[in-house]
Every structure is written in structure tokens, then in C-alpha cells.
Amino acid sequence: ELCRQIVHFNPSKLIMVDINENALYMLKQEFLVMKRKQQMNDSIQLESLIISIREREEIYKLMKSYKPDVVYHAAAHKHVPLMEDRPTEAIRNNIFGTKNVIDACCDCGISRFIMISTDKAVNPTNVMGATKRMTEMYMQSRNTKCKIHMAAVRFGNVLGSNGSVIPIFKEQIKNGGPVTVTHRDIKRYFMTIPEAAQLVLQAGFYANEREI
């Protein structure tokens, strides 16, 4: 969704990086169809790159080769129960992977870095939240030593996103139930996927140093 909204601002080039090859392929195909239907500026250059944020050398090559104006960092393991079972995976990916991206942005002179975080980073009570809080702290400490604009955007529940409660509820209902909830009196607050993407883009424009 973030890429879909970015193309409406007519960037000269959009570099889409993911470890999920199928998602990356399908997104590029969607954009090519939009170009053919003249729903998107045909002059926008599209690059699809399969790279893991854990591969420090590859991330540095990416930044040095393309020198992007803005980096939006959304890669993370976010499923709370799974990360409780595999905390080392959460640490390797969420902390050290993000560190690779931040370091590369600083060392390669990228102008802006925007990181997707979570409200679970506030007084974290689980592994996922703790890893995201550590990445926020690293971003803030690193930004004192490099002259680029950095910010983290904290999200709560994004309606319909992968791993969010609505797709889980739909699947449970489809399979005949039961529908599981944490507690019968719990309240959840949601934003839509387009609203979340707009917030990230606004943060990219207004972000100052070390803001969350």
C-alpha cells in the first residue's frame, strides 16, 4: 500500500525491496498494468530487488548503488506469539536487520529514513515490542552521529493488514469457529491500511531528527 501511494507522487524511481519474491513480483505486475492503463506515470522507473535486511553487505550495496532520497523501512517480524517462541529470530531480524539499514543510510548519506514501529514498543511486555523499542533507541542514538532526518512511526492495529485480527476472525468464521479473543471486555482501535500508509508518508515529509 505504501508503494501504491508513493507512485501517485510521481517519483523518478521507486525501488521495492523485499525477501518475499512472490509479493514483490505481484506488486510490480500490478504497477505495469497500471502503466498500460495510463493510471500511473509511465516515466516512473520501477526496481524490484530481493534482499534480506540481515545481509549487511547487500544493504550497503543497495544504498551505494541507488542513493535513494528517502528510505521507508517496514521489514520486521511482527507476530507476537511466534516471536515469543523464537526470540532469537526476532532479535536477528528486527534489531540487527534494522541496524544494518540504519547504518547503511548514515554511512551512504541518505537524506531521510522512516521506520515503521509499533505501539507495543511502549513499555514492552513481549519480545516483538521489546525488539522494536530497541530499534527506536538505536535510531535515536545513531542519529546523533549522522546528519540525516530520521523518524519512527508507531502503529496500533491496522485493519486488514497481514497478521491483523480481522483476517484471523474471517478465517475462523469460514472454518466454523470458534472466534477467539484475548478478553471479552478488550477494546481495540484500528486505522485502515491507506490511513497507515498516509501517516508514514507524512512522517517522511515532516520528520525531524530522532522523532517518534
Describe each model-derived feature in a short phrase:
Residues 19-23, 53:
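Helix N-cap at the beta1-alpha1 junction of Rossmann-like dinucleotide-binding domains, i.e.
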Residues 48, 115, 152-154:
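Conserved beta-strand scaffold in the Rossmann-like NAD(H)/NADP(H)-binding core
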